[in-house]
């Protein structure tokens, strides 16, 4: 009982330890996932901060590049001129900047298209040149290539013929082995049949010999029985004769009695 309790307690401990290990592995996996998500979030934040900084730097650079706004103008009556003109100038500058940016982007796209066309044309010309060079080289080495092709064809034919002959030889050997196995099997069957026939003949001969012995014994017994019967018949006849003599000796006037016994078959 004590051993069973200790075993059950050790098993429960192993089960509990396995559960704790699973919980620990799960908690570690969750911690790894949290760390990965935090690192990804921090990377995203850093990217956003860098983008915002670049945007702010660009805006500040544009502000610095812009010319200083002129001071407020005063008309002849001593009143400040409306800021509408300055706003118009600002809007005009922005439109000019947009146009300049659009023109710059257009030039970049145009340049990219031209570069792509040049690259495609260059690739086409290189391909044509390579094809032409290959054709010229093939034309120069036509005879050599034909000889090499013929050599390889002949070599392939020799290899195929050799493989075919080897395959035919393997098939022939396999057929010979199968035929030999069949002959061995047939020979074994014949030997088994001959053994069975010999065994049957031996059994028949033994049975015939036993039957002949039994017949001889029966004949001998019959002969002995016949001899015993003959002896008994002779003994009976002798006794009958003696009895007749005795009877005749006592009374000679009596007629003779004749007795006869039938021999049993």
Swiss-Prot record:
Residues 1-66 are annotated as: Necessary and sufficient for RNA binding. Residues 67-265 are annotated as: Necessary and sufficient for transcriptional regulation. Keywords: Chromosome, mRNA processing, mRNA splicing, Nucleus, RNA-binding. Residues 1-54 have a biased composition (Basic residues). A motif (LXXLL motif 1) lies at residues 164-168. One of its GO terms (cellular component) is nucleoplasm. Residues 60-76, 85-105, 180-192, 229-245 have a biased composition (Basic and acidic residues). Residues 1-105, 172-192, 229-265 are annotated as: Disordered. It is found in: Nucleus; Nucleus speckle; Chromosome. GO terms for molecular function: cadherin binding; pre-mRNA binding; transcription coactivator activity. A motif (LXXLL motif 2) lies at residues 193-197. The keyword RNA-binding applies. It comes from the Eukaryota. GO terms for biological process: mRNA processing; regulation of alternative mRNA splicing, via spliceosome; RNA splicing. Its main location: nucleus. Dual function regulator of gene expression; regulator of transcription and modulator of alternative splicing. General coactivator of nuclear receptor-induced gene expression. Belongs to the ARGLU1 family. The N-terminal region can bind RNA; preferentially binds 5'-CGG[AG]GG-3' motifs. The non-classical LXXLL motifs are not required for nuclear receptor coactivator activity. This is Arginine and glutamate-rich protein 1. It comes from Xenopus laevis. The gene is arglu1.
């Amino acid at each position: 009982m004590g051993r069973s309790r200790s075993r059950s307690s050790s098993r429960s401990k192993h089960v509990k330890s396995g559960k704790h290990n699973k919980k620990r592995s799960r908690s570690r996996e969750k911690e790894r996932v949290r760390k990965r998500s935090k690192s990804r979030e921090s990377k995203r934040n850093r990217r956003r901060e860098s983008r915002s900084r670049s945007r702010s730097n660009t805006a500040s650079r544009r502000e610095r590049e812009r010319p200083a706004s002129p001071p407020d103008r005063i008309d002849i009556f001593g009143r400040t001129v409306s800021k509408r003109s300055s706003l118009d100038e600002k809007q005009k500058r922005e439109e000019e900047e947009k146009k300049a940016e659009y023109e710059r982007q257009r030039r970049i796209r145009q340049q990219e298209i031209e570069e792509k066309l040049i690259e495609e044309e260059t690739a086409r010309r290189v391909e044509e040149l390579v094809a032409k060079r290959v054709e010229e080289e093939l034309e120069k080495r036509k005879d050599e290539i034909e000889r090499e092709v013929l050599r390889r064809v002949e070599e392939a034919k020799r290899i195929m013929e050799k493989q075919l002959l080897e395959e035919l030889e393997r098939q022939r050997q396999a057929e010979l082995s199968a035929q030999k196995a069949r002959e061995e099997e047939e020979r074994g069957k014949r030997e088994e049949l001959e053994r069975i026939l010999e065994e049957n003949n031996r059994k028949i001969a033994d049975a015939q010999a036993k039957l002949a012995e039994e017949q001889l014994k029966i004949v001998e017994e019959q002969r002995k029985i016949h001899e015993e019967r003959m002896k008994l018949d002779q003994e009976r006849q002798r006794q009958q004769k003696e009895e007749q003599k005795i009877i005749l000796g006592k009374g000679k006037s009596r007629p003779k009695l004749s007795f006869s016994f039938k021999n049993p078959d």
